[in-house]
């Protein structure tokens, strides 16, 4: 029998399911405690979240870069891929604001603009995968994902790390639509031959509208970052598109809700948060123009402490997003890929609100674990790498606080009901 919130061991039980947390804390609220579990359709009150970092402020460059971004997307033809009303909704949502809240004024203008462009593209791409016409057309979504994989493989087609990720992507495409994907896979392999032979440029490969825009961002990134470091961000993108396929496979098979452990693993990649942390390599490269700073070597980057730090930061942002997106994506749109829904189902919570409150407890634990991993990483590293490590952790903290401020203010989520202190939540958050 699954544990329930009546048990004092609930927090400990759920932690032990998917990580090694051992500290137990009391839930902050007992809202909706009664003999009957509330259905998912009932009112959800987002738990009050207070982060241990300063409140994020919107970068004054945001509106200018947002306008440039939508002009760029229009020039790539993406505005013609969605209904006019949907396009206007994307514009009104000010999707670049998440970058504006997460990146301070000291960021280089070219980095800020790149992040605005990629982020807005990502929101639209993700919507196409979840509820656009791609959601009903597996052939189209698989084709886009194979093209993205080709882009990521192009510069280093024999890289073992990338080949391993690529194999899992190709296997998933076959598992989802074996007959319909044959021609697409044949084209992918033919294009990979060209990549290995260097017989033509990546720009010469014919691609769809969305993937052409992604290629534009990718080529700008690899022009600036040494080849030995581009593999890092390429892997994060591969994990993201692989998770998109997993979600699509689950929808096709009408799979039941995953357990918490499996969901957390999938969510770590499906949120496409990792690239924002690894993008720091380009920020560091730009800093090197002005002052000496060493990149984090692969021995440290792929080491236990660095990976623990990045995984914890990724979990924090993804779980936080699940709380705020729950009314929109799960209650209204019926998407079960949400941690609130998963915890609600697996742990027999009395309400979705209580499931959200439990997740906040875990979220604060993950922040503490991120900070602990940072201290361990810094202690283990030579002093010459400390500045780069500090840039990485600052970026993690900034994206956590910036993402929170974006979710609090964005019309995309429009959460207005909170379980927490009786005072105005935004007022408390700004103190």
Curated annotation (Swiss-Prot):
Alphabetic keyword roster: Lyase, Magnesium, Metal-binding
Database matches in Pfam families: Terpene_syn_C_2
Binding site for Mg(2+) 3: 321, 325, 329
Reactions catalysed, as given in the entry: (2E,6E)-farnesyl diphosphate = (-)-alpha-gurjunene + diphosphate; (2E,6E)-farnesyl diphosphate + H2O = 5-hydroxy-alpha-gurjunene + diphosphate
Binding positions (Mg(2+) 2): 130
UniProt pathway: Secondary metabolite biosynthesis; terpenoid biosynthesis
GO molecular function, one term: terpene synthase activity
Family: Belongs to the terpene synthase family.
Protein name listed in UniProt: Alpha-gurjunene synthase
Origin species: Marchantia polymorpha (Common liverwort)
UniProt gene name: MTPSL4
């Amino acid at each position: 029998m699954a544990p329930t919130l009546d048990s004092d061991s609930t927090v400990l039980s759920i932690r032990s399911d998917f990580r090694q947390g051992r500290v137990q804390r009391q839930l902050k609220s007992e809202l909706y405690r009664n003999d009957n579990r509330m259905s998912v359709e009932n009112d959800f009150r987002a738990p009050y979240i207070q982060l241990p970092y300063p409140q994020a402020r919107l970068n004054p460059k945001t509106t200018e870069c947002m306008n440039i971004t939508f002009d760029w997307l229009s020039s790539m033809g993406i505005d013609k891929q969605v209904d006019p009303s949907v396009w206007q909704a994307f514009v009104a949502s000010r999707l670049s604001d998440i970058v504006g809240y997460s990146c301070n004024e000291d960021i280089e203008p070219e980095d800020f603009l790149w992040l605005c462009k990629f982020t807005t593209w990502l929101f639209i791409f993700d919507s196409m995968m979840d509820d656009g016409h791609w959601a009903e057309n597996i052939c189209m979504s698989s084709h886009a994902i194979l093209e993205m994989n080709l882009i990521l493989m192009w510069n280093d087609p024999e890289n073992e790390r990338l080949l391993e990720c690529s194999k899992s992507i190709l296997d998933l495409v076959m598992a989802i639509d074996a007959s319909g994907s044959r021609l697409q896979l044949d084209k992918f392999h033919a294009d990979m031959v060209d990549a290995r032979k260097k017989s033509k440029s990546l720009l010469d490969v014919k691609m769809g509208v969305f993937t052409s825009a992604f290629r534009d961002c990718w080529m700008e990134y690899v022009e600036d970052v040494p080849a030995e470091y581009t593999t890092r961000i390429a892997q994060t993108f591969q994990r993201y598109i692989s998770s998109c396929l997993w979600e699509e496979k689950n929808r096709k098979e009408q799979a039941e809700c995953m357990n918490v452990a499996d969901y957390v693993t999938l969510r770590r990649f499906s949120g496409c948060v990792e690239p924002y942390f690894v993008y720091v390599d380009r920020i560091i490269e730009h800093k090197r123009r002005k002052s000496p700073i060493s990149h984090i070597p692969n021995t440290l980057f792929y080491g236990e402490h660095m990976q623990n730090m990045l995984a914890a930061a990724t979990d924090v942002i993804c779980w936080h997003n699940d709380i705020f997106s729950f009314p929109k994506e799960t209650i209204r749109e019926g998407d079960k890929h949400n941690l609130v829904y998963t915890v609600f189902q697996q742990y027999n919570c009395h309400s979705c609100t209580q499931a959200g409150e439990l997740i906040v407890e875990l979220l604060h634990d993950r922040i503490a674990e991120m900070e602990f991993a940072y201290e361990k990483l810094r202690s283990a590293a030579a002093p010459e790498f400390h500045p780069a490590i500090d840039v990485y952790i600052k970026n993690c903290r900034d994206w956590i606080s910036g993402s929170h401020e974006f979710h609090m203010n964005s019309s995309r989520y429009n959460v207005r009901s909170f379980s927490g202190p009786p005072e105005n939540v935004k007022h408390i958050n700004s103190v």
